[in-house]
Amino acid sequence: MDFIPTQTFYGRRWRPAPVQRYIPQPQPPAPPRRRRGPSQLQQLVAALGALALQPKQKQKRAQKKPKKTPPPKPKKTQKPKKPTQKKKSKPGKRMRNCMKIENDCIFPVMLDGKVNGYACLVGDKVMKPAHVKGTIDNPELAKLTFKKSSKYDLECAQVPVCMKSDASKFTHEKPEGHYNWHHGAVQFSNGRFTIPTGSGKPGDSGRPIFDNTGKVVAIVLGGANEGARTALSVVTWNKDMVTRITPEESVEWSAAALNITALCVLQNLSFPCDAPPCAPCCYEKDPAGTLRLLSDHYYHPKYYELLDSTMHCPQGRRPKRSVAHFEAYKATRPYIGWCADCGLAGSCPSPVSIEHVWSDADDGVLKIQVSMQIGIAKSNTINHAKIRYMGANGVQEAERSTLSVSTTAPCDILATMGHFILARCRPGSQVEVSLSTDPKLLCRTPFSHKPRFIGNEKSPAPTGHKTRIPCKTYSHQTDLTREEITMHVPPDVPIQGLVSNTGKSYSLDPKTKTIKYKCTCGETVKEGTATNKITLFNCDTAPKCITYAVDNTVWQYNSQYVPRSEVTEVKGKIHVPFPLTDSTCAVSVAPEPQVTYRLGEVEFHFHPMYPTLFSIRSLGKDPSHSQEWIDTPMSKTIQVGAEGVEYVWGNNNPVRLWAQKSSSSSAHGNPISIVSHYYDLYPYWTITVLASLGLLIVISSGFSCFLCSVARTKCLTPYQLAPGAQLPTFIALLCCAKSARADTLDDFSYLWTNNQAMFWLQLASPVAAFLCLSYCCRNLACCMKIFLGISGLCVIATQAYEHSTTMPNQVGIPFKALIERPGYAGLPLSLVVIKSELVPSLVQDYITCNYKTVVPSPYIKCCGGAECSHKNEADYKCSVFTGVYPFMWGGAYCFCDTENSQMSEVYVTRGESCEADHAIAYQVHTASLKAQVMISIGELNQTVDVFVNGDSPARIQQSKFILGPISSAWSPFDHKVIVYRDEVYNEDYAPYGSGQAGRFGDIQSRTVNSTDVYANTNLKLKRPASGNVHVPYTQTPSGFSYWKKEKGVPLNRNAPFGCIIKVNPVRAENCVYGNIPISMDIADAHFTRIDESPSVSLKACEVQSCTYSSDFGGVASISYTSNKVGKCAIHSHSNSATMKDSVQDVQESGALSLFFATSSVEPNFVVQVCNARITCHGKCEPPKDHIVPYAAKHNDAEFPSISTTAWQWLAHTTSGPLTILVVAIIVVVVVSIVVCARH
């Protein structure tokens, strides 16, 4: 069985157990449902005995002599003490309640006489994890036949009838918060169940997780250790399906898996790592044997449990929790390392040498590793006020108060443990660590410490108004972490003066030390290890001996400046305290700038106190992101369109602004006001119309004059050619000429000279005729009806209750429709997208972070050679250099001159901060759109979560809605993305296994804990110079650090369509793009018969006030009469207006006040109330607010809506030129007819 049908396995409704029809008499009673343990039976017997003895004791005291009362006294005193002692160790209230609930619904699964896991009764099923092998400890449940589901790692069977009352209910409702299980509280957040690390363990598989009502919300399968918390692997329920949540690196929590992998071995003897039974497994009794045991288990998963247990003898006293993590330092010692700058002496071997300095924290705190040990006294005891370091004569001690750390000024020491120091320092170019007891105890190392700024403000300190943002800081806790450092036994130290002679006999006296020797007497050579005095030779001359002091009872740090004793040395590891963890940091919040809203633009006046980042992006298709650091007072103006803009000032929250279509003048006034109004809204359209109108007037006037000239020429030409011909009166009137034979220009000249009044009267006659004709044409034009329809919100009326349509994929923009079905009243329908999520399908390629170069202590072979051996490490390099460290030079202490060899090793691994500070490279595939939609059917409102894929239905009672697929397949994510902290970058990267040195991906691994580490850092070993022991090498700087400095703008700030990018999981929220197809199947129960709804008669509709392009800025009053009181559906059948309310109460008579939104300056729309319709008409004024912080609830008009007043003025303006043109055409036609008739 590869799957479990949801409806049959999990989806059953809870029903009470059926009533039994008969009870067979001869059958024995049902077996007990629970097998009580021996301890529980003893407690029960003891409690019953106490209850039985109490009344008898009272009777004895009253009837008999007091001499018989003493025997029951010890019983009476002993019985109450037992429960009182148990009350001290009882679990908390949350755990007690959970134990009561699960007491009857879970049963242990036994394997080889031990509890391997649990089976749980949920609903009508018995559920047991498939990986939990064994038999259920109940005779009824042990006989059941289980069906296995490998997908969910579960086995299930039907609950026996006699045990149905013991089963628990289950629920799919899981709001974020805390839940209960056997070991306390379980936190549910971001779709994950987590518990504090240590509260769950192998053997808990199958335990249920309850809510506060006692219902099961999940069943535990295992867990994944994530440091301070453990993520649980569970099977849980969603609304319509079963799901399994499996964190990365989760481990099955059956006890059998623990027994197989978690045992340690010593001389073929297996034992639990936290309880070694052997005597040598105690550091205080056998240090060398204990270190060898730990070295053998160096790669064991339970190494640290073994380390903790071997630091104490079985009869020893366990340390307090505050010092438990210091116990590992009992097996270590400080050392003398190489220091680059010891003060006036220059470089030198120093007891306080600095090994490494980290500055990965966002708050500027430094983490320093030194060669001394803090918190451990010289006597190898834990003392937080002491420091021990390696001096010339052995281990020395100093007070912790003498420790100081400084850069350009003294630092604040925040925490110390062992080799590590946490300090908050000022910026500087070097770090100094010193002990004030001796000026020589000082070490400096070059380190560039620059101020770290987090957020968008470079404030020196978070003063004034503050907020907290996510960041990375070093934890001050000393608990176990995944970071560790390697230790090994100290190198062999040359020692002399151990050979003594008595006559010809020579002996070697180690003097309470363990030594290695190699002595030569003639041709005889003796070598070995000695701890007691031994006789070497009987020689005539003194033998030549080379002796080394060996110490295999203690570890020291695996430093590159200290040689190791052997090639395969006894090694161990201890954890590194103060890990880099997720936290929140306080940052300053810059005062908001002064903002001035204008028409289509916003002006900012900045007065920053320190450099502050100002970023802008458009919420349309082209984000056009820009950002700049502002550190001086200045003003800046940005353009704001209808699609909106988003700006971020410093660490303030993002602000989104949208421009409204507003103007300072009205569209219903004089021509100047109208032109100003449309110029504010549509400048290009207005200029185009005015230019076209002017061109029309000029062309029409010029063409009219040309036609008149042509007509006059045609009618006068015949008479001018005939001498003495007299012009008829009709022709003279038609051609505006005199009947005299004199030339026209001469007549005009004569009238201008002698009678100007007659000149003007004759010239005004044709002009008057033209004006009269133009007015007539204008009056005809005014009789034409002018109407322009614009597109508004999608408002439709459907004729069936099975319908398909589309809605905009924009948050807050409603889709409204009226469903009309014959015989039923109209049913209003509204759909609004509340939230949308575009979740891509990701395939993780690898993670990358800062690398750590591991340089083991070099192996130096005096008077001989060494060979390299391959190791399975990333970018591993090994070289052997001969002829190094001349005779007794530096720290090698070799007795040969040119035959000494050094084997240098170096490799790369993930840095200490990799777990908390890393980037993930993903390949992006198809994305799925999930929307949260509020659906209103009549008076029913419900919000549903549905996948917009055209397949997954959303149900509201009996109605079904199928959304999608979306009209345009689009995603803001490229085919490759990089996720770093809470930011997503659309960037390409090198494939896995092909990283380049100094680039992103120079070190790669599948997860932060996997062993498949790949690295390419151009690592090369160099020949060591004479002097101190060291391992020189060259390497390309970290590509991850370079990428963090040079990375581009994250998609969070540069996403188109106003997308909000988030991670965990990677998704884009509330993107404004495309349309969503909707397929609806409305159930009959939602409809109301027409005879049951009011019958309304509408009288009049008056638009009382109207502001266009505003959020429901119009108010219409509709007077009505109705046959009865009831509810009516309200709907607008015109695209020019959107009604706010879908349903309103009606009385027998009255008036309805309806709010509507429109983008038209003069809307004309049809409103339906119940079964009646009426047309509303009104004139709207522009909104006063030019910029608003919300998007318009209606669609903008594709073409400018023109008011009636504007049409009238346009008609007045164009009627005159058109009339002149018409008259000119008529004159030409008449003249042409007359001339043709004469011929």
Curated annotation (Swiss-Prot):
Lipidation (S-palmitoyl cysteine): C705, C708, C715, C735, C736, C1236
Keyword Transcription regulation in annotation: no
Region (Binding to the viral RNA): 78-106
SUPFAM superfamilies, per the entry: E set domains, Trypsin-like serine proteases, Viral glycoprotein, central and dimerisation domains
Protein's GO biological process: fusion of virus membrane with host endosome membrane; proteolysis; symbiont entry into host cell; symbiont-mediated suppression of host toll-like receptor signaling pathway; virion attachment to host cell
Disulfide cysteine pairs (residue numbers): C105-C120, C264-C273, C278-C282, C281-C313, C339-C443, C342-C348, C411-C425, C471-C585, C519-C545, C521-C539, C715-C736, C849-C914, C862-C894, C863-C896, C868-C878, C1059-C1071, C1101-C1176, C1106-C1180, C1128-C1170
Annotated region (E1 fusion peptide loop), positions in chain: 884-901
Keyword Cell wall biogenesis/degradation attributed: no
One Pfam family, short name: Peptidase_S3
Cytoplasmic side: 708-751, 778-779, 1238-1239
GO MF entries: RNA binding; serine-type endopeptidase activity; structural molecule activity
Post-translational modification: Structural polyprotein: Specific enzymatic cleavages in vivo yield mature proteins. Capsid protein is auto-cleaved during polyprotein translation, unmasking a signal peptide at the N-terminus of the precursor of E3/E2. The remaining polyprotein is then targeted to the host endoplasmic reticulum, where host signal peptidase cleaves it into pE2, 6K and E1 proteins. pE2 is further processed to mature E3 and E2 by host furin in trans-Golgi vesicle.
Swiss-Prot/TrEMBL domain comment: Structural polyprotein: As soon as the capsid protein has been autocleaved, an internal uncleaved signal peptide directs the remaining polyprotein to the endoplasmic reticulum.
Biased composition annotated in UniProt, kind: Basic residues: 57-95
Other notes: Belongs to the Old World alphaviruses that usually cause fever, maculopapular rash, arthralgia and myalgia.
Record protein name field: Structural polyprotein
InterPro entries: Alpha_E1_glycop, Alpha_E2_glycop, Alpha_E3_glycop, Alphavir_E2_A, Alphavir_E2_B, Alphavir_E2_C, Flavivir/Alphavir_Ig-like_sf, Glycoprot_cen/dimer_sf
Catalytic residues in the record: H131 (charge relay system), D153 (charge relay system), S205 (charge relay system)
Transmembrane residue ranges: 687-707, 757-777, 780-800, 1217-1237
Residue ranges, annotated region (Interaction with the capsid protein): 710-714
